[in-house]
């Protein structure tokens, strides 16, 4: 039993080592200024979607700071302590993020919808399709332009046929976060924006 437990711990450590090496390699090759933080707690309910990370104001973090993982955008810092930060996830029902449809350049806002993102009140004349990839638009200066966000997996048209809505599945598996990237902008961001 003890040998089996040690074997399981070793396998887990090897997997974690591989993930960390991959993240460090990505950080070194990224044009963005980043650092790696570890997720210390997850709080996910139907409407509220947050994680807690092990860095805070003492590490230079700021409210609104973009947070990613290797798969794409996961959220932004919304509560800051000296040695920890709460990150609101992109799927939280109070979160919104400016996006761009990669195929067409259409820009709109994606809203958190529990486990997915929702695009609401998009004119029916807009070219939007299931399978379209959504990236950050760069508007608002919180998220650099072009970061992977989600892919559209369903669409509907309003009863009066003036608007269409879409649901999008995030690229990042938000229920399996262990390590994240914190992104610093090229120019300083003030919290008064």
Residue spans for each PLM region:
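N-terminal leader/propeptide and maturation segments of large enzyme subunits in energy/redox metabolism
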Residues: 1-3
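A secondary-structure micro-motif
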Residues: 5-12, 18-193
């Amino acid at each position: 039993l003890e040998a089996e437990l040690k074997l399981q711990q070793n396998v887990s450590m090897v997997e974690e080592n591989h993930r960390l090496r991959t993240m460090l390699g990505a950080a070194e090759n990224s044009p963005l200024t980043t650092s790696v933080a570890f997720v210390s707690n997850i709080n996910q309910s139907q409407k509220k979607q947050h994680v807690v990370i092990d860095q805070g104001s003492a590490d230079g973090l700021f409210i609104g700071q973009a947070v990613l993982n290797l798969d794409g955008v996961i959220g932004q810092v919304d509560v800051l302590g000296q040695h920890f930060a709460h990150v609101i996830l992109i799927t939280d029902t109070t979160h919104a993020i400016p996006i761009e449809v990669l195929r067409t350049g259409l820009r709109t806002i994606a809203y958190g919808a529990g486990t997915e993102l929702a695009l609401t009140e998009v004119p029916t004349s807009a070219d939007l399709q299931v399978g379209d990839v959504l990236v950050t638009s760069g508007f608002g200066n919180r998220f650099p332009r072009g970061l992977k966000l989600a892919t559209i997996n369903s669409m509907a048209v309003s009863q009066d046929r003036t608007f269409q809505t879409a649901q999008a599945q995030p690229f990042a598996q938000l229920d399996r976060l262990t390590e994240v990237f914190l992104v610093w902008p090229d120019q300083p961001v003030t919290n008064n924006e």
